[in-house]
Each structure stands twice: as structure tokens, then as C-alpha cells.
Design a protein with these regions (language model features):
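Bacterial Sec-dependent N-terminal signal peptides
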Residues: 1-11
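Cysteine-dependent hydrolase recognition
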Residues: 11-195
């Protein structure tokens, strides 16, 4: 497999071997997950490239959601990004004053704990028109970042790209082993479907 690696401002890009023509995809992961699951993530990148979807892998020790979003917007503008998958420990935007955008979640934000009354949402990453006001980072769950949906923001969702998350479950098994096994299965399924 041929790929090039480019490091800019702490995040590292593993570029696809396939040239980007019409669209691209990205795997966004943390440095620890990349190091532990590098072979599986690169195999996933390669199989998607063979299917005609050039795929970037971008990893970093992400400090805040804004850093992740900058990379996504850059890939969208430069490389026609159509979607991303977040793998491992990627910051989780916890939205407040945005319950009207959910289908069923309604809770009094003033009288309930922030964690319970906020909406975890990757719309922070995949709808580029939405605007947010940073409030704080959670003191216990340091991967949670609280934002208000800004008053000047659009009040409806219109995603520019699609997104998904692959995260280990808390079942006592080592998280990277779970992620590694998952991507081995995904690649194997793609290989079966491609034959």
C-alpha cells in the first residue's frame, strides 16, 4: 500500500494512495488509537480506496472540538470531503440551548446537571453553518465540551457531510482491542462484497 504522511500543526494526515477526483472520506482518530490500530485503520483506508473512495486518516492528541472541525472543513474545501468517521477518543460537543433540534430529548437545563441536560452531538462537526458559543470543558469527563447554540446560528440542521462514531464500549475489554477487531471485521466484509 502506498500512502504519504503529512504532519501539520500537530495533526498527522495519512493521505490516500488513490487520487481524489470527485469525493473523499476521512477517518479522524486520536494518536493512541492510531498507534494501537494502525494496521487495521490503514487496511480500511486501502479497501475504501480500492472501492473508489479516497480516504484520509487524520490523527492527533485533540485538545478541543474546534481543532477537529478545522481539519474537517479544510478537507471539505480542498479534497471534496463527503463524510467522516470518528474513531476512539475524539472530543464530544455537548450542546445546550439546542433541544428544539432533537426529536425527543427535552429537559430543564437550569435545574438539571449539565451532563444530563446537554445533547451530545456531532452536528458541531458536520453542519458547517451552525454556530456555537463555548461555555466550558467538563471537569470530570475531560472529553466533553459544552457549547450553547448561538443566537445568531441557523435553528435547523443541514449537514454538509455525514459522520459516524466508532467507540469502544465499557465492558472490561481493552478499548483498542475492540476497535482493532471491529475494523478487521469491516475490512473482511468489504473484501467478501468486492469478490
Amino acid at each position: 500500500m502506498l500512502c504519504s504522511i503529512l504532519s501539520l500543526r500537530a495533526q498527522t494526515f495519512v493521505k490516500p494512495a488513490v487520487k481524489v477526483k470527485d469525493t473523499s472520506f476521512a477517518v479522524i482518530t486520536d494518536k493512541g488509537t492510531f498507534q494501537a490500530c494502525e494496521a487495521e485503520l490503514k487496511a480500511y483506508q486501502e479497501i475504501l480506496g480500492m472501492e473508489g473512495l479516497p480516504t484520509f486518516i487524520v490523527y492527533n492528541e485533540w485538545n478541543k472540538p474546534e481543532d477537529v472541525k478545522k481539519v474537517i472543513v479544510k478537507l471539505y474545501k480542498k479534497d471534496k470531503l463527503e463524510g467522516v468517521v470518528f474513531v476512539g477518543d475524539i472530543p464530544i460537543p455537548m450542546l445546550r440551548k439546542a433541544q428544539h433540534m432533537t426529536s425527543a430529548f427535552k429537559m430543564d437545563e437550569k435545574n438539571n446537571d449539565w451532563r444530563d441536560s446537554s445533547v451530545p452531538s456531532d452536528r458541531f462537526y458536520d453542519d458547517f453553518d451552525l454556530q456555537f458559543d463555548f461555555l466550558k470543558q467538563d471537569s470530570v469527563e475531560n472529553n466533553f465540551f459544552y457549547y450553547n447554540l448561538a443566537i445568531k446560528s441557523p435553528q435547523q440542521i443541514r449537514c454538509d457531510i455525514y459522520s459516524a462514531r466508532v467507540k469502544a464500549v465499557d465492558n472490561g475489554e481493552e478499548p483498542h482491542a475492540q476497535i482493532s477487531r471491529y475494523f478487521k471485521k469491516v475490512v473482511a466484509e468489504h473484501q467478501i462484497n468486492n469478490n
